[in-house]
């Protein structure tokens, strides 16, 4: 059900402020039966105190049984039906980087990968190289591959192993499959067209993959490329129109900036490299008076999960916990903390498991949950929600929705 027409009628502008904190991939699993999840293992005194004053529940970001990508996971949290509002990873990266991304272009998100002499993937992220190394290799590709046939090829560094390619030319469509096999020990997949109009794009992506491998054959780690999320430039309703909000985003990585800009948020500058939590906190404080909705993104919880680093993920949760008192001191009227999906270190991948949701607002019903963990969230008064149900709940608690019906 598309609630946007209803919410447009009910939404009203008020001075109350909403803060949505997304701990990327926060949900986890025990490493062994009976053990703690990452959240349960973390020492989080500030989150524990907050949980005692809040309501908790579980949230299925997209749909039961589906392991969502960050795109649909986030869009659902912002209230956009992820089955109706679909956007590829390439477009999100292009929007987040502020790339020269035009109507008719096809953008692809790339990972530099390490391939063995037989062409099989050894490391899907090339050892997470420094961004400076990425920039060096991208410069090499820009010089060597300005075009594929009559199509212009634009390369952009994103961060670490991530990069962006934009294809510009006549007759390009974006219905092509990914080349990332999603596991090691296999060669990169061939891009395949999902409709007749996209056959040219699929062929060009395969030619580009081969050419990149030729150019980078002497690189010790970054000697191959995996592509996913081929997409053209989308157009979505803006949060200002639907919710009557003045929204801002505080994120470091281009994909999340792209998601935010796609739905109408102003992306605030953040000082520092990587996840830059101190820089994000500074941006939040400096801009607190200018907006009534803030999206605050924490990335490294997800990265540690994907790397299979259980203790690293625990540490990232604890780092966030240490910042929480300064965030709470700003006095948001409504505060939500959740994730866009689960990334258990045990699985080294996104999973279908629900994530915990914490909600602090003036008019909550108390519950018995005492920690921000998966197990405690099952006891919470919020019950079990789907991702798209979160935004109406936040708006209601902030006094931003009128009564529905007579």
Swiss-Prot record:
Biological process per Gene Ontology, one example term: glycolytic process
Protein name in UniProt: Probable 2,3-bisphosphoglycerate-independent phosphoglycerate mutase
SUPFAM superfamilies named among the record's database cross-references: Alkaline phosphatase-like (SSF53649)
Record keywords: Glycolysis, Isomerase
Function statement: Catalyzes the interconversion of 2-phosphoglycerate and 3-phosphoglycerate.
Reactions catalysed, as given in the entry: (2R)-2-phosphoglycerate = (2R)-3-phosphoglycerate
InterPro entries tied to this protein: Alkaline_phosphatase_core_sf, ApgAM_prokaryotes, Metalloenzyme, Pglycerate_mutase_ApgM, Pglycerate_mutase_ApgM_sf
Family of the protein in this entry: Belongs to the BPG-independent phosphoglycerate mutase family. A-PGAM subfamily.
Organism: Thermus thermophilus (strain ATCC 27634 / DSM 579 / HB8)
NCBIfam families: apgM, PRK04135.1
Keyword Isomerase in annotation: yes
One MF annotation (Gene Ontology) recorded for this entry: metal ion binding
Enzyme Commission no: 5.4.2.12
Pathway noted in the entry: Carbohydrate degradation; glycolysis; pyruvate from D-glyceraldehyde 3-phosphate: step 3/5
Signal peptide interval: none
Keyword Isomerase: yes
Gene3D superfamilies the record matches: Alkaline Phosphatase, subunit A (3.40.720.10), Metalloenzyme domain (3.30.70.2130)
Pfam hit, one: PhosphMutase
Domain of life: Bacteria
HAMAP family tied to this protein: ApgM_B
């Amino acid at each position: 059900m598309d609630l946007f027409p209803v919410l447009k009628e009910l939404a009203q502008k008020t001075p109350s402020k909403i803060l949505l904190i997304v701990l990327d991939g926060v949900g986890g699993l025990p490493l062994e039966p009976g053990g703690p999840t990452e959240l349960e293992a973390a020492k989080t005194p500030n989150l524990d105190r907050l949980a005692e004053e809040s309501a908790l529940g579980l949230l299925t970001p997209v749909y039961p049984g589906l392991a969502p990508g960050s795109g649909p996971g986030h869009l659902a949290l912002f209230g956009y039906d992820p089955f109706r509002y679909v956007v590829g990873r390439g477009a999100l990266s292009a929007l987040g980087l502020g790339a020269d991304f035009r109507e008719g272009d096809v953008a692809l998100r790339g990972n530099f990968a390490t391939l063995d002499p037989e062409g099989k993937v050894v490391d899907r992220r090339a050892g997470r190289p420094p961004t400076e190394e990425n920039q060096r290799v991208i410069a090499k590709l820009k010089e060597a591959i300005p075009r594929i046939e009559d199509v212009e090829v634009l390369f952009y560094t994103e961060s670490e192993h991530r990069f962006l390619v934009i294809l510009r030319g006549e007759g390009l469509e974006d219905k092509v499959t990914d080349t990332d096999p999603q596991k090691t020990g296999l060669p990169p997949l061939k891009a395949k067209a999902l409709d007749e109009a996209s056959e040219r794009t699929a062929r060009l992506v395969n030619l580009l993959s081969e050419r990149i491998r030729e150019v980078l054959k002497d690189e010790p780690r970054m000697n191959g490329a995996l592509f996913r999320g081929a997409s053209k430039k989308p157009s979505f309703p803006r949060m200002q129109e639907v919710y009557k909000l003045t929204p801002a985003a505080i994120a470091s990585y281009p994909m999340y900036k792209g998601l935010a800009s796609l739905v109408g948020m102003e992306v605030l500058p953040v000082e520092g490299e990587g996840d830059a939590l101190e820089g994000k906190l500074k941006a939040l404080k400096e801009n607190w008076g200018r907006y009534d909705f803030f999206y605050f993104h924490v990335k490294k919880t997800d990265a540690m999960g994907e790397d299979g680093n259980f203790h690293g993920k625990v540490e990232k949760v604890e780092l966030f916990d240490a910042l929480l008192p300064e965030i709470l001191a700003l006095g948001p009227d409504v505060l939500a903390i959740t994730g866009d999906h689960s990334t258990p270190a045990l699985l080294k991948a996104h999973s279908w498991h629900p994530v915990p949701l914490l909600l602090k607002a003036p008019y909550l019903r108390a519950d018995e949950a005492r920690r921000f963990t998966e197990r405690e969230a099952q006891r919470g008064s919020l019950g079990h929600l789907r991702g798209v149900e979160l935004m109406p709940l936040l708006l209601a608690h902030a006094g931003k929705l009128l009564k529905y019906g007579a």
